[in-house]
A protein has these predicted regions:
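Soluble FAD-dependent oxygen oxidases
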Residues: 1-265
Length: 265
């Protein structure tokens, strides 16, 4: 479903109403992007429901009642869930070869409508200031966490099990002279979201991390056991390319995150 940016407050309110009572059958992804065909700033909502179409239409009726400017409702088998096209998913991606992307992420535990509204306006200003970077997107992912919370936190290495929302901006840099300014916007986004996240410190899903550090990705409480496992199974720190658990200062200084294996002898 595609919505005008002016519908943002209504969308945030629906998301807040769902809150922590999100059915386990429901998965929501909001993507704020720029699309000239639809008047510039848009909000796409990719809503999935595991179950009958009739249940899905009832569950997503609050979104449909807002009269999206574009919508596509389909029923697909499990085998096609990742390959099926998503409305509004065209354009550049952080995973495209040769793409220069600056990603900034935050875990959220509460939904602050004022913070989301301010961030939307800042993104509109960003698109105006950096028209060559209008392939950039802001993503908000909301999944049911009832099953995640059913596992005790100290039983696994997976941190931040009570996360309500995963959000990030993927800022596309198509003009090298704008690196600093675009990264400054990303840092501002991360600070704004973290301040309204529901916790006093920054927490980031490890796969979305950049340079925040291992305590932010894995949590301080889990690091002692993780480092013990690292010393046992990877004492040479060979598997340390991306957001690793570090066990030596020397390796921390020498690791090259730009190319897998470039520092291996």
């Amino acid at each position: 479903m595609r919505f005008h940016s002016r519908d943002n407050t209504s969308l945030w309110e629906i998301m807040k109403d769902i809150g922590s009572n999100q059915p386990r059958e429901m998965a929501l992804t909001f993507q704020v992007n720029w699309n000239d065909e639809f008047g510039g700033l848009n909000i796409n909502v990719n809503a999935k429901w595991v179950g009958p179409m009739e249940e899905a239409l009832i569950a997503f009726s609050p979104f449909l009642s807002l009269n999206p400017i574009q919508r596509s409702i389909t029923q697909i088998p499990w085998t096609s869930i990742y390959s099926s096209p998503v409305l509004g998913s065209g354009g550049s991606s952080s995973c495209d070869r040769g793409t220069k992307s600056s990603n900034w992420a935050v875990n959220l535990y509460t939904i602050s409508i004022p913070a989301l509204t301010r961030t939307l306006q800042k993104l509109a200003d960003f698109y105006s200031a950096f028209p060559s970077s209008r392939t950039s997107v802001w993503s908000i992912e909301k999944f049911a966490n009832s099953v995640t919370l059913s596992t005790q936190d100290d039983e696994t290495a997976y941190p931040w099990r009570n996360t309500t929302i995963y959000t990030f901006v993927a800022l596309q840099i198509n003009d090298d002279s704008q690196d600093d300014a675009i990264n400054a916007f990303g840092a501002s986004f991360q600070a704004e979201m973290a301040a309204s996240s529901g916790y006093g410190d920054l927490r980031v899903y490890m796969n979305y991390g950049r340079d925040e550090g291992e305590e932010v990705w894995y949590s301080e409480g889990k690091l002692p056991r993780l480092k013990a496992l690292k010393r046992k199974y990877d004492p040479m720190e060979l598997f340390s390319h991306y957001n690793p658990v570090m066990i030596s200062e020397q390796h921390k200084k020498s690791v090259n995150h730009g190319r897998l294996g470039s520092d291996l002898k």
